[in-house]
Amino acid sequence: MIVFDNGTRVFINSSTNKDIYVGFSGFGFEKDIGGILGIAHLLEHILISFDASRFVANASTARSYMSFWCTPIRGRATSVDAVRTLISWFFDKDGLKDDFPVSKIKYHIKELENEYYFRNEVFHCMDALTFLANGDLYNGGRLSMLDRLEDIPLILRDRMRTIIGPNVVIFVRELNDVVLSLLANTFGRLPACPLTIPCTVRTIIGGKTIMMPSPFYTVMVRVEPSLHNILSILCLYEIYHLVDYETVDNKLYVTFSFIHEHDYERFLQGSGRLNLTIYKKIRLCYGDDFLMNVYLSFPCIRHDIFDYLTIVNTDTSSMISSLERDIYQSVRTGDYIVVYPNFSNTMSNTADRQLHKTVVINPNIVYASQPTTSIDLMKKQTHNEMYIKYSDAGFIDYVQLALGLRRKIHKHVHGIHIRHQFSADDIKTILESDTFMKYSKSKPAAMYQYLILSFFVSGNTIEDILQHRESVVKLCRTYKNKIVLGKQTRYDIQTLSSFVCGIFKGPSVTSEYLTDIMWKLKRKGLIYSLEFVELQKNMFYLFMFTIYPEDVTTYLSSRKLFTSRCVVVSKKGNTEDFSSMKKDIIIKLR
């Protein structure tokens, strides 16, 4: 680890696939509370800009921090190019960027609204802790920000000026004199302390139960944010599933998720005690995303994570015992947050400005002081890789499992790969639980891309496909048909979602061309993401959720490289109507 004079920390991580990865603590959604929700996320979208033909890059905004990374496409750019590109997002020749014209901001706000729509159609993107801390269930920005468009540049400028050296963490894959000089002359010259200290209002959350869609019964127990408690939680995270942590407003919560309601009840009633045995040596080996989260979330961890190995492996017993005392003291006094699975369409909280269907109540669980049973947690196994074919009957369940557990899904031609550390029995237990099955079926929007794809590539009518939704993925991937695009170039339908999809063909159409189209549509604020799959040579199926379906359709129809196309435009409604979707099936007998 290298520490610049201003407190910026630089770590060399040769195992990462990100050539440069930069995080900023105290720079997330929390900073928007009391002001315009979404400023942090808007700033993320404004800052990141790169040539998609030379680099792969991304950024994310969390509750308490923001992070950015960039890596070159080999043969098209170098590692130093990636470092220069990321630095250019924050610095120009005059120093730290803080001037953002209104003319560009409005398009980013439109993109934020599309991201909000996408995330709430495909995922349950709700933040219970920020909501209870006077934020909202969704804090990523909405179209209503346009009402205060003239105020936003000044707010963005002030937000940028809060960046200080001690809050910056940098991971680099390779460090040489050029990279070190670039970092030292930019991030290394940030102020060591803020020029202004904003007034913050501390929020007392207390004990609450929030009822919202969730695959598990989750309890967030407040504990002291001491170094030993933090290290103890990291130990538990390393060896057990469904154990994690959350931070909000400088408060630390250790989270336990339960598959069965009776385990959750026993834990809060005190009749069951968690088995938190540390049964193997702790290695503190984490992925770069989790490690960045740790460094940014906990200012007390100022050293390299491996400097704490001796402590966690020699003082494990006393550390865990101390954490347990904190946990059960908070459970006794009701200082915890419960996320209780609920999928009802009738419950609504009028204080929720995002109009999500949720309700908040005070917990009424009586604590019994004599534990009589032990609650075992799922142990993490060695790293495994699960391959699920698109034709697998349980394909959608596995996708929902990966999303619910925040696992990355690697897409391939005939299926997906998911890396995990579950035993086969544990996966079976989760997939067969009532709560998970309800959660898996509570977001049907993701299936639309497979429904329409099946219509185009299979010999089935839309009526047949709708009658067999659960097996539609199998229909998508077993075709051997030749697709011929006819005179009808557009179908207008009504579903429970707003999206544009279809088949696009042209001799010069490639995946790179479609990626370029995606970025152009994003810059116009018309979409958040675009999914595509190649069906035949130079013929692709495209799908994108959007709140501007007509604008997206007009843009796609104007692309001259698309010599043939058939577009499906879905208008959102309370009922489904696919009646316009007709096709001819030609059978050749030989």
Curated annotation (Swiss-Prot):
Enzyme Commission numbers on file: 3.4.24.-
Cofactor comment text: Binds 1 zinc ion.
Pfam families for the chain: Peptidase_M44 (PF03410)
Catalytic center residues: 44
GO MF annotation list: metalloendopeptidase activity; zinc ion binding
Function: Seems to be involved in viral proteins maturation by cleavage at Ala-Gly-|-Xaa motifs.
Protein's name according to its UniProt entry: Probable metalloendopeptidase G1-type
UniProt cofactor(s): Zn(2+)
Spans traversing the lipid bilayer: none
Keywords annotated in UniProt: Hydrolase, Metal-binding, Metalloprotease, Protease, Zinc
Binding locations of Zn(2+): 41, 45
Family, similarity comment: Belongs to the peptidase M44 family.
SUPFAM superfamilies: LuxS/MPP-like metallohydrolase
InterPro entries xref list: Metalloenz_LuxS/M16, Peptidase_M44
A single BP term in Gene Ontology: proteolysis
Enzyme class at the top of the EC tree: hydrolase
